């Protein structure tokens, strides 16, 4: 299994816009891709705003390519996301998952920020 990691930053006032876009537009799209096994969106407040980390899980690099295309190390950042982020990684990092466990979550563990 492959874990794909991408980082970005947003202002406190725009972080919710990115979270909303990721959870209502991007994640539903990637869930339909063969070989996608899950995703996590992490958020932490930092001195100059909010750091966001997206972790996606894939069966293989072939599955990653179904999402990212022929340049799987290049980040896929939609224009709507670019508009609300102050910075983001142009390239992602891939890890081979060697062990792991996550309890099943039957519903979202968070509430989307109000617009």
Features from the language model and the residues they span:
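An amphipathic, aromatic/His-enriched active-site/gating alpha helix that lines ligand/cofactor pockets
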Residues: 24-36, 57-94
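Non-catalytic surface loops within mature trypsin-like serine protease
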Residues: 10-12, 60, 96-99
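Short, well-ordered beta-strand segments in beta-rich or mixed alpha/beta enzyme
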Residues: 2-9, 40-71
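Glycine-rich beta-strand-turn "strand-cap" elements at beta-sheet edges
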Residues: 40-50, 76-115
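Short, surface-exposed ligand-recognition loops at beta-strand->loop->(often short) alpha-helix junctions
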Residues: 9-22
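Short, flexible segments with low predicted structural confidence
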Residues: 1-2, 18, 36-39
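Short acidic, gly/pro-rich beta-turn/loop elements at beta-sheet edges
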Residues: 16-18, 49, 64-66, 102-104
